[in-house]
């Protein structure tokens, strides 16, 4: 199926890489052998590849330890693959050029990796090292737009999506069909164990790839592709011989009956897989067209056919192909589909997606991309198990059944009614919310919203509508048939693209109007007035809302071609602007599906940890007002954000290209492909819900005033302050902040969020490293002091880089036997860790005052620690040294920092009280939450009187028998007849459920309240009388 190139014996490198006169082939000779013998490149491509290799090979010797396992031979193979992948993607001759035919230039990424003996997962994990090091060379050779043309993050997102979809398809196929074509009623155990893939399974996947290639065009989002797979599944059910079925239409509870006509196949699949019946029918029609065009099969209306396959199936609207999967035609159909795919993708340099039909293929790799750019999987989860493992896709988020199913006689679902959540099922559930709740809304302001818009000093309705249309057209550009428009990873090449963009644009528009109305209502209640002129005439506020709405739509569909932060570029705002809006959105997030709440949580964290600190962030514009002492360094590094492009400028660009928007000058130039550390950015990093505590404090309240620290219960929560100050001019006084400017309020709130985020990460590392609470306090105080007194250390850097250096610095002054390697290994053991953060740290040598070094570059974390971090923070470290080592360290040489104490900086606070983890609701109908209990809190929490209500790992309430018996005993105590204080009856369905929002708020209040105490036992509310 897949083209397998010859596998020559590539000469290997020794530790010297270049073999200086040792008799072995040189580095250049090994690369030439790789190109000529391994991939059979023609002369032009070989010359171009050798040029890029020659200009970048000097970087290889300095990067060996940071690539793979750190061996020269392996690093060399990676570098060869990186160079050839870049040449393939960036060469002008490869840009949609079919003139190459089947020549030597038609090599694919999979062929490169086979010759290099690498797998896809490892390739994408290590690619950022090459990108950040060779970026200037690629820019010189291929132009400044090389990052967009390389499309590394899009290709990686596509790989993750296909990994998820292939597993989803495999599970679905095995639910309906036997894994081997046996005439017996049992599946072949040996076939399942060996990973055997039947020809029917293979045919379905190849037909799906044809659908992706010819019908979905550029927009291959996860939801659309899942609809495609379900459509393929319907075609297989109709055409695969009955002897291979793993179900019975009469007995299976999975199917919906359509009166006396039989099973309504499409309605049944929609119920099982949460798809739209309308979309499913449209996708099936496209697939049928492809069967006709590619396989040259003749279609017939299923109602006119008499086939065993169609018995007991309602055939209305279904198409049947007589000999589609007959034993005689199946082999030729497989060959035709394989050749069609190869011809369509030969010159694109992308993945050969046929490898996913066989999970045993060595190219796929043993791991996942959980810690890299496309972080769809989360901590402790593989690539196919996003979301809470115990959560099902039933209530409260599962929408109602499809219209046709609601009028049919439905058979109650069996095992499929509670399907374990996976990334695909979660995406489909979220998409159904968007389809059933948001899509029916009108694409214009509601009468209530219009009242707010017309109540301003002058009616702003027209301005709001015009702005929304222009910005959303910029994010989801339309394009005429045959036109091509590349915008931040978005390429419109067909009518399908225009339809897709129009649908997403309407969804974002309706969501924007709905949220805007809710925000206006809340703001009017706070101000006791309907005139919101200051807010509703603020351009930045509206663009942030539009960007947030579009991002939620994109996150719902999980597009692989428009990844965050593309919405920032299209709207002209910065990461700091969006972080304010995300904070506001948490006030109104109760109606959002769980996964969109998680997306906002993870987006907030990603913005805070690095993006807000990158060059071009509007945070620096506010910082120079709030902290004038930092203006010189901010200006020297050219960190200030450029002015936001006007609506007229955006509209002008749209008119130039007849409705599509060419790339505008980017306000976040380095955010397109790379973070400031060279890591490929991801649209979704799974974030456990406890992180919502970072943003539950109102985004626009100054922590200096501590207004929100006096609340003890949700009922006593005071109304949040007005939004106007959040998006006002930085120099404008904030009337509700006691004389502060709006910039000071914004920076104080931002710093408080950074402190909270730092506390979470420090606490997690302390636990993994098994350090004492005293060390934790010292590290946390150092982190706070650096933020307030050495703020420039954060400029252009990731906060994890600062945290890691804090750990090592405190370990040194505390005389702990903790090495840098141990700290990094501990961090990298976390699946969410991005190793590039520690392998590539920004350094400006001119500010470091180091002789012989000038300019800017990215270095490893140890170099940064020695050359930049320690000279700046040594005085702070000496002050924080534990008793006994302080005096000794005071006599050491100290170097004064350049920042100094910033006026108005928040005072250093003790380590905050943090929740162990967000409690997880284990049942939709039972009022039961599960949360881990740390041993440090066990003794304080579990008193003698309440100990029998807890089950602790490693400790039983009586002589241990078994875990199940212990849990049963506890449950019996809770639900026994004896009247116990605070007894909770989990079997009563009528008991009021505790909402997720209430739980999140209780955690927030525990962290923020001065009266809260981590050592106080948790008192349960008495629910029975």
UniProtKB/Swiss-Prot annotation:
Renumbered residue ranges of the record's region Disordered: 1-20
Entry-linked InterPro entries: Cyclin-like_sf (IPR036915), RB_A (IPR002720), RB_B (IPR002719), RB_fam (IPR028309), RB_N (IPR024599)
Coiled coil residues, start to end: none
Subcellular location(s) per record: Nucleus
Region of interest called Spacer, as start-end residue ranges on this chain: 624-744
Positions of region (Domain A): 422-623
Main location (coarse class): nucleus
Chain residue ranges for the region called Domain B: 745-875
Assigned keywords, A-Z: Cell cycle, Nucleus, Repressor, Transcription, Transcription regulation
Gene Ontology CC terms, in alphabetical order: chromatin; nucleus; transcription regulator complex
Domain of life: Eukaryota
Pfam assignment, any one: DUF3452
Chain residue ranges for the region called Pocket: 422-875
Database matches in SMART domains: DUF3452, RB_A
BP term (GO), one: cell differentiation
GO molecular function: RNA polymerase II transcription regulatory region sequence-specific DNA binding
Described function: Regulator of biological processes that recruits a histone deacetylase to control gene transcription. May play a role in the entry into mitosis, negatively regulating the cell proliferation. Formation of stable complexes with geminiviridae replication-associated proteins may create a cellular environment which favors viral DNA replication.
PANTHER family per record: RE32990P-RELATED (PTHR13742:SF17), RETINOBLASTOMA-ASSOCIATED PROTEIN RB -RELATED (PTHR13742)
Similarity remark: Belongs to the retinoblastoma protein (RB) family.
The name this protein goes by in its record: Retinoblastoma-related protein
The organism of origin for this protein: Camellia sinensis
Species classification: Eukaryota, Viridiplantae, Streptophyta, Embryophyta, Tracheophyta
Gene symbol of the encoding locus: pRB
């Amino acid at each position: 199926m897949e083209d397998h190139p010859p596998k020559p014996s590539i000469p290997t490198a020794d530790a010297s890489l270049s073999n200086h006169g040792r008799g072995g082939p040189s580095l250049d000779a090994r690369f030439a052998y790789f190109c000529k013998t391994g991939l059979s490149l023609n002369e032009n491509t070989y010359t171009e590849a050798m040029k890029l290799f020659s200009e970048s090979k000097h970087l290889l010797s300095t990067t060996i330890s940071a690539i793979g396992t750190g061996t020269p031979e392996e690093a060399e193979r990676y570098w060869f693959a990186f160079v050839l992948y870049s040449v393939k993607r960036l060469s002008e001759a490869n840009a949609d050029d079919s003139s190459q035919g089947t020549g030597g230039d038609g090599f694919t990424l999979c062929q490169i990796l086979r010759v290099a003996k690498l797998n896809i997962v490892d390739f994408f994990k290590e690619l950022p090292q090459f990108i950040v090091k060779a970026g200037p060379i690629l820019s010189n050779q291929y132009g400044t737009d090389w990052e967009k043309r390389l499309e590394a993050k899009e290709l990686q997102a596509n790989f993750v999506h296909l990994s998820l979809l292939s597993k989803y398809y495999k599970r679905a196929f095995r639910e309906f069909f036997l894994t081997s074509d046996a005439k017996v009623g049992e599946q072949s155990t040996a076939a399942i164990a060996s990973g055997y893939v039947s020809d029917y399974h293979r045919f379905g996947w190849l037909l799906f790839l044809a659908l992706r290639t010819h019908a979905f065009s550029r927009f291959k989002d996860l939801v659309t592709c899942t609809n495609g797979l379900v459509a393929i599944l319907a075609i297989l059910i109709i055409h695969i011989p009955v002897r291979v079925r793993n179900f019975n239409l009469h007995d299976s509870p999975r199917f919906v009956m359509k009166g006396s006509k039989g099973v309504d196949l499409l309605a049944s699949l929609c119920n099982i897989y949460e798809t739209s019946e309308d979309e499913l029918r449209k996708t099936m029609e496209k697939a049928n067209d492809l069967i006709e065009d590619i396989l040259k099969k003749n279609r017939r209306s299923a109602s006119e056919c008499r086939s065993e396959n169609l018995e007991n199936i309602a055939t209305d609207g279904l198409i049947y192909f007589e000999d589609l999967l007959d034993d005689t035609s199946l082999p030729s159909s497989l060959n035709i589909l394989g050749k069609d795919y190869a011809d369509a993708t030969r010159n694109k340099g992308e993945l050969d997606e046929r490898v996913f039909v066989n999970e045993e293929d060595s190219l796929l790799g043993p791991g996942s991309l959980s810690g890299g750019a496309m972080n769809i999987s989360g901590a402790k989860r593989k690539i196919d198990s996003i979301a809470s493992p115990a959560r099902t896709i039933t209530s409260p988020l599962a929408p109602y059944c499809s219209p046709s199913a609601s009028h049919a006689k439905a058979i109650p679902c069996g095992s499929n009614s509670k399907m374990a959540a996976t990334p695909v099922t979660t995406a489909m559930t979220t998409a159904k919310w968007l389809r059933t709740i948001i899509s029916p809304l009108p694409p214009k302001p509601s009468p209530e919203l219009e009242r707010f818009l017309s109540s301003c000093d002058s009616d702003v309705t027209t301005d709001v509508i015009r702005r929304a249309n222009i910005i959303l057209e910029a994010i989801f550009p339309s394009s005429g048939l045959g036109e091509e428009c590349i915008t931040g990873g978005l390429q419109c090449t067909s009518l399908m693209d225009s339809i897709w963009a129009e649908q997403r644009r309407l969804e974002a528009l309706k969501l924007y109007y709905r949220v805007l109305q809710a925000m206006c209502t809340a703001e009017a209640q706070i101000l006791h007035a309907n005139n919101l002129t200051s807010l509703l005439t603020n351009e930045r506020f509206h663009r942030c809302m539009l960007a947030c709405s579009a991002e939620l739509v994109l996150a719902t569909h999980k597009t692989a071609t428009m990844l965050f932060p593309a919405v920032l570029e299209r709207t002209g705002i910065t990461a700091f602007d969006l972080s304010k809006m995300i904070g506001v959105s948490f006030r109104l997030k109760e109606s959002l599906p769980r996964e969109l709440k998680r997306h906002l949580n993870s987006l907030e964290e990603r913005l805070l940890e690095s993006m807000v600190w990158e060059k071009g962030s509007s945070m620096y514009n506010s910082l120079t007002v709030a902290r004038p002492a930092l203006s010189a360094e901010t200006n020297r590094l050219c960190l200030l954000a450029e002015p936001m492009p006007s609506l007229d400028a955006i509209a002008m660009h749209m008119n130039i290209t007849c409705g599509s928007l060419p790339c505008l000058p980017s306000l976040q130039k380095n955010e397109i492909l790379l973070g400031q550390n060279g890591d490929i950015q991801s649209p979704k990093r799974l974030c456990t819900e406890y992180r919502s505590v970072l943003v539950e404090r109102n985004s626009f309240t100054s922590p200096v005033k501590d207004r929100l620290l006096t609340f003890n219960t949700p009922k006593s929560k005071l109304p949040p302050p007005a939004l106007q100050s959040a998006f006002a001019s930085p120099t404008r006084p904030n009337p509700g902040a006691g004389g502060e400017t709006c910039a000071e309020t914004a920076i104080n709130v931002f710093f408080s969020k950074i402190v909270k985020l730092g506390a979470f990460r420090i606490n997690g590392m302390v636990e993994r490293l098994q350090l004492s609470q005293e060390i934790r306090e010292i590290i946390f105080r150092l982190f706070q002091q650096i933020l307030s007194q050495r703020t420039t250390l954060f400029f252009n850097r990731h906060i994890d880089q600062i945290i890691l250096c804090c750990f090592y610095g405190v370990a040194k002054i505390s005389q702990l036997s903790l090495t840098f390697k141990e700290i990094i290994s501990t961090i990298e053991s976390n699946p969410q860790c991005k190793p590039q953060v520690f392998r590539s740290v920004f350094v400006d040598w001119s500010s470091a005052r180091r002789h012989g070094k000038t300019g800017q570059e990215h270095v490893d974390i140890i170099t940064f620690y020695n050359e930049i971090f320690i000279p700046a923070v040594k005085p702070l470290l000496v002050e924080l040294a534990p008793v006994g080592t302080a005096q000794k360290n005071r006599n050491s040489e100290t170097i004064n920092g350049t920042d100094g104490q910033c006026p108005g900086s928040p005072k250093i606070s003790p380590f905050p009280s943090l929740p162990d983890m967000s409690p997880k609701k284990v049942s939709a109908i039972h009022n039961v939450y599960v949360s881990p209990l740390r041993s440090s809190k066990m003794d304080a929490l579990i008193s003698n009187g309440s100990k029998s209500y807890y089950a602790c790992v490693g400790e039983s309430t009586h002589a241990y028998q078994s875990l199940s018996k212990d849990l049963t005993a506890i449950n019996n105590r809770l639900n026994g007849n004896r009247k116990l204080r605070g007894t909770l009856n989990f079997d009563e369905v009528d008991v009021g459920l505790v909402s997720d929002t209430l739980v999140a708020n209780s955690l927030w209040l525990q962290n923020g309240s001065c009266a809260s105490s981590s050592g106080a036992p948790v008192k349960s509310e008495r629910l029975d009388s």
